[in-house]
């Protein structure tokens, strides 16, 4: 009887044997970090969301001004909750008393020290894809805040930029349309119709090939399924 060879690796941080999925995630992240650094991003990998919260929080000094886009990732992982417990100037539009105050916070975010968000998709070679309805998120990613930190679960990784765009349009956008109960064709059947609906949330398609200036953007890859 031939013996089965089982691949395993020891995690020196957690002092336990890594699962095959954890091994795959780490190897994928290592490859992507190299590609992102070639594109002038700063990049790290966190196996868990809890570790990512600690790492991102450590990047932000007390007294900093911080804002974020409408990201389920950073909310669900507890990052915004952790930041609310610190001595920071938080520009949180969810706390706005009315629409006018929310609009003011949108604009103040462009002067923030740190802007936090996720992405709809990222290719294995490091191109980040986002689709926006209002454009405030992709605008802040592109220009304004001193530092942008993008927290991206490995569930959003696609083989190449075309697959990343397809994921953003066919997975993230229909789910977000359902989340906001927006009356678009994709809300009805879960499929992108490349529509021009008045309520479309796919008005701005953004590809980020490089971080400019170098190091302005930090990508935190997380070995968990986060966001849409």
Question: What kind of region is each of these model predictions?
Answer:
Residues 15-18, 37-40, 87-90, 101-103, ...:
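N-terminal start-of-chain detector that recognizes signal peptides
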Residues 25-106, 110-116:
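N-terminal active-site beta-alpha-beta segment that forms phosphate/nucleotide-binding
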Residues 4, 34, 50, 124-126, ...:
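Active-site-proximal helix/loop capping residues that flank conserved catalytic or ligand/cofactor
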Residues 110-228:
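Conserved phosphate- and dinucleotide-binding cores of soluble alpha/beta proteins
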Residues 4-7, 11-14:
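Short, positively charged and aromatic/hydrophobic N-terminal segments
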Residues 19-20, 94-96, 148-155:
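Flexible, glycine/proline-enriched loop segments at strand-loop-helix junctions
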């Amino acid at each position: 009887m031939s013996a089965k060879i089982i691949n395993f690796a020891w995690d020196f941080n957690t002092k336990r044997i890594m699962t095959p999925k954890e091994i795959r995630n780490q190897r994928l992240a290592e490859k992507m970090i190299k590609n992102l650094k070639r594109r002038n991003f700063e990049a790290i990998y966190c196996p868990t969301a809890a570790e990512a919260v600690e790492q991102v929080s450590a990047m932000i000094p007390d007294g900093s001004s911080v804002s974020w886009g409408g990201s389920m990732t950073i909310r669900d992982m507890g990052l915004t909750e952790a930041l609310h417990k610190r001595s920071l100037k938080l520009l949180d539009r969810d706390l706005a008393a009315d629409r006018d105050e929310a609009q003011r916070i949108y604009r103040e975010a462009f002067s923030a020290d740190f802007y936090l968000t996720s992405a709809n998709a990222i290719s294995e070679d490091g191109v980040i894809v986002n689709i926006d309805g209002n454009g405030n998120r992709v605008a802040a990613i592109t220009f304004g805040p001193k530092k942008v930190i993008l927290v991206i679960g490995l569930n959003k990784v696609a083989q190449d930029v075309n697959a990343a765009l397809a994921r953003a349009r066919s997975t993230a956008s229909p789910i977000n349309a359902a989340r906001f109960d927006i009356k678009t064709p994709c809300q009805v059947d879960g499929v992108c119709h490349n529509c021009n609906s008045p309520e479309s949330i796919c008005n701005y398609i953004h590809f980020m090939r490089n971080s400019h200036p170098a190091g302005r953007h930090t990508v935190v890859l997380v070995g968990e399924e986060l966001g849409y």
